[in-house]
Amino acid sequence: MNDKKLMDRAADNIRILAVSMVEKAKSGHPGGAMGGADFINILFSEFLVFDPEQPEWAGRDRFYLDPGHMSPMLYAALTLQRKFTIDDIKQFRQWGSITPGHPERDIAHGIENSSGPLGQGHAYAAGAAVAEKFLAARLGNTMMQHKIYAYISDGGIQEGISAEVGRLAGNLGLNNFIMFYDSNDIQLSTECGAVMSEDTAMKYRAWNWNVLEIDGNDPDAIREALIAANKEEHRPTLIIGETIMGKGALQADGSNYEHSIKTHGAPLGGDAYINTVKNLGGDINDPFKIFPDVQKLYDDRAAELRKIVAERHAAEAAWEKENPEKAAQMREWFSGKAPKIDWSGLVQKRDIPTRNGSAACLGVLAEQVPNMIVSSADLSNSDKTDGFLNKTHALTRDDFSGAFFQAGVSELAMACMCIGMMLHGGVITAMGTFFVFSDYMKPAIRMAALMRTPVKFVWSHDAFRVGEDGPTHEPVEQEAQIRLMEKLQNHAGQDSVRVLRPADSDAATVCWQMAMENMETPTALIFSRQNVKSLPEGTDYQQTRKGAYIVTGSDEQFDVILVASGSEVSTCVAGAELLRKDGVKVRVVSAPSEGLFRRQSKEYQEQILPRDAKIFGLTAGLPVTIEGLVGANGKVFGLNSFGFSAPYTVLDEKLGFTPENVYKQVKAFLA
């Protein structure tokens, strides 16, 4: 046990580094970092187990920061661990630095997740805890015996996702999940009492959490709480630490600056900064100095960790020798490579909903990808993720031998937890719901794109053909929204999300193949509720891989090209037949992914959709969904309003999504 005086000094060193980063950058959030320094110091110098030489070691404990604005606290602690240099943290918030304003995933430097909108970070942690339990059920406790730590703030607790995660983590009994709640009662514009008055401890106890309430600035109390949390066998643990915003801060006149809203989101500034550094024992002429005894504390912990990890590695090596097949499997799972899948035995039925085609694909994956977890937001029998569920069983408390995560009606938590499972490593995740409910998931989709986490989003009921449920459940603008993510590039220059909307069940197979092969970015798969007429016999479905391809009319001169995705392709095919009877030469193109199509050669793009061609686009979404493919000389028939409640066949007729109206629209276009 380390001396309390030393631990206080180490926390003060973290505070000095944090406020100095913010001061030098002229922006940032010092107050919360100052209040949380005691917890992060105890956790990082006494509890967190990792390999100083192998940052990606699968058996490491993982720490997920939810309030990313508290990055100075995290960067300071990681600097004491020698994962950042003083020069690194002096470049806080600057162009090209590895210390951005909010942390971005960087395993080599000890950062497990990008910290985005409040609430998501601790959901990643809960997902990681599920992944660890899932893998332990398959590999055993020698390889999987680590803890998942999360840090959440008042703002994160206020976010609705905290209730979703609280319920799910408690229901699953994730005793490997330990979360510190930094309760300082201050947020950016008010004290927390202005917006919250509930009993947070009681709330989490009701969700089956082990709740410990402590002084969050007392190192002895923090240590005791972490020891107790590590011993918990049946429940996740919430450590509620009452902390002091801006602990140790002084104003310009030397008076107390603690518990002030002003310290939350701006540099202390001028004499307040000088007085604070001095008050904490720092040298204002060298504020980035690390105290020698504090550095020794962390170096001693690193030496201790090398011994701990050496014993763990020896046990792992013995396990690998005794279990060569499992060891090879584990290496493959953590490699980040796409799994090997034999699709040859899958024969799709014709003229079925593409969601049913997806279900058949998921059945193949359930049999051949043993490290895959699929989830649904209480819709497995409708979004047809039950194609996977029917060949496994759900994860439950004390039984993680299954591979289906029942998320209940919690779309955002489901998405974030599935992302967290993949951030942990060793698993592949997919999750399903209705396309209209993707709106609940947008913050998670964006963060998955930013972190390049290759989760699979499965969205069924893709258009107004949801029918009788009416406009609240009929997606119109959603496809345009998600396809914007194909136009947004990630920092590796890739389309940030790969979006695929197949034309029929056989195309759905190829889209699932591509989704499973894509281990670099998220993939969105969009499927129909209703039956979809299969494409003509002889269609080369592997052309789906090019994002857009000719379905009919490839060998003739054409007067017009009809282009669509998903259900609308078969409508175009039928409309083309009517046009041909009238002497019009027609080419039909299926475009499941404009982003993928734009990644093809200019020659291929010109071959499929020549720029000077007359192109007619059909979309059940907003016209803008397909305008990029139609071009300046083209015409789009889409939906400019919300849908209506009626059988989908009636809606097709009323809204103009029939072969006859395609004929009418194209004839007018060519006139």
Annotate each language-model stretch with its function:
Residues M1-K147, S162-K289, K296, A302-I526, N531-K533, ...:
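Thiamine diphosphate
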Residues A150-Y151, M179, S375, F616:
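Residue-level marker for buried hydrophobic side chains located in beta-strands
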Residues E159, I222-R223, S382-K384, M414, ...:
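Short, well-ordered alpha-helical microsegments
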